[in-house]
Swiss-Prot record:
Homodimer. It comes from Trichlorobacter lovleyi (strain ATCC BAA-1151 / DSM 17278 / SZ). Its cofactor is pyridoxal 5'-phosphate. This is 8-amino-7-oxononanoate synthase. It catalyses: 6-carboxyhexanoyl-[ACP] + L-alanine + H(+) = (8S)-8-amino-7-oxononanoate + holo-[ACP] + CO2.
């Protein structure tokens, strides 16, 4: 009977056009094989192309040979190794904070940080389009969750005025929003946090390595360095490695070490990952990192311009996330399938990841894409869009 219930629920998912399955993708380069079919990759978060960079691969290999393949314990037992402290020091110097604390993934970081900071009697103010891990962290915390309209600082100000508490008030926002590629108005949000004595946390997963001086992210890009209590970032996107971190004060770090369950009850990141991440942090601050960021920006502008010229209502912007709105989930799935047949791999994004009626192709561009590859992708998106009546 229990399995029959699961089967019925899965059948409904299929009926609603929301069924998901896994596809095998070889490597993260612009040209890949997807289940044996050659295609241009336009849905990877490998923004700077560092996942294939030889310096990261060499650092990982050297660390595995020197330290082994696993930390074999949580950091509070015996899994706190010198490489953890080394990487945290590099992170805090890069992000301009007192210190930093590593987590095993962006999801583990957001759920672990938010559920540790807030609890009953506290209030969390979250942008309506924040990542699911932020929402899940808020729900796990037991705090009251108030979601404000997307990037609307006037609405946030009203909500902060209306909802007082003797406990903690925490404002959480994405820096770059993962489905639309737009940037949070951090100047205004930081002003409100200070005015209303609230903590401010920014999820900078999609901006680290991409925006700001030396790729420091949206906090630097928006000019609010020193005004954000917690900067959450990841290594699995522009930095080409794996894991996540909180760049913060020593007080917040100590608090999280004692309260964050996703940190306390997880085996810590392995040596190879730590070394690769450290190499990436160094690289994005160097001249090569600046060159890659410029190429990424140029490619983002080219992709947006060509899609706009084709007739798509694509927003202007400087981030590598470029949404092509489709609408219905079933049409989006067909669009993605047809694109793969045309030699372009772009995943369709459907509910619950995005609201109903806003399904889309989430195109992402990399620094390693050539102008010709971008033109090929747009030509295919244009052909299929006309075929399906989207364009």
């Amino acid at each position: 009977m229990p399995l029959q219930l699961l089967s019925q629920r899965l059948e409904k998912t299929q009926h609603d056009g929301l069924y998901r399955s896994l596809r095998s993708v070889e490597r993260t380069t612009p040209q890949v094989f997807v289940e044996g079919r050659q295609a241009l990759l336009f849905c990877s978060n490998n923004y700077l192309g560092l996942a294939e960079h030889p310096s990261l691969a060499q650092a990982a290999a050297d660390a595995a040979l020197q330290y082994g393949t696993s930390s074999a314990a949580s950091r509070l037992v015996s899994g706190n190794q010198p490489l953890h402290a080394m990487l945290e020091a590099k992170l805090s110097a890069w992000k301009g904070t007192e210190t930093a604390l590593l987590f095993n993934s962006g999801y583990a970081a957001n759920t672990g940080i938010i559920a540790a900071l807030a609890g009953r009697g506290d209030i969390i103010f979250s942008d309506r389009l924040n990542h699911a891990s932020i929402i899940d962290g808020a729900l796990l915390s037991g705090a009251r969750l108030i979601r404000y309209p997307h990037n609307d600082t006037l609405a946030l100000a009203r909500l902060l005025e209306q909802h007082q508490t003797d406990g903690l008030r925490l404002i959480v926002t994405d820096g770059v929003f993962s489905m639309d590629g737009d940037i949070a108005p951090l100047q205004g949000i930081a002003d409100l946090a200070e005015q209303h004595r609230a903590l401010l946390m920014v999820d900078d997963a999609h901006a680290g390595g991409v925006l700001g001086q030396q790729g420091r992210g949206t906090v630097d890009f928006c000019g609010v360095t020193g005004r954000v209590a917690i900067q959450m970032g990841t290594f699995g996107k522009a930095l080409g490695s794996f894991g996540a971190y909180a760049a913060c004060s020593r007080l917040v770090r100590d608090y999280l070490i004692n309260r964050s369950r996703s940190l306390i009850f997880s085996t810590s990141l392995p040596p190879a990952v730590l070394a690769a991440s450290a190499a990436a942090v160094e690289l994005v601050q160097a001249e090569e990192g600046q060159q890659l960021r410029q190429q990424l920006t140029d490619n983002s502008h080219l992709l947006r311009y060509l899609l706009q010229q084709a007739g798509y209502k694509v927003p202007d912007g400087c981030t590598p996330i470029v949404p092509v709105m489709v609408g219905e989930a079933e049409t989006t799935t067909r669009f993605s399938t047809r694109l793969l047949e045309e030699g372009v791999f772009v995943q369709g994004i459907r509910p619950p990841t995005v609201p109903k009626g806003t399904s889309r192709l989430r195109c992402t561009v990399m620094a390693s894409h050539s102008p010709d590859q971008i033109q090929q992708a747009v030509a295919a998106i244009t052909r299929v869009g006309r075929e399906l009546g989207v364009l």
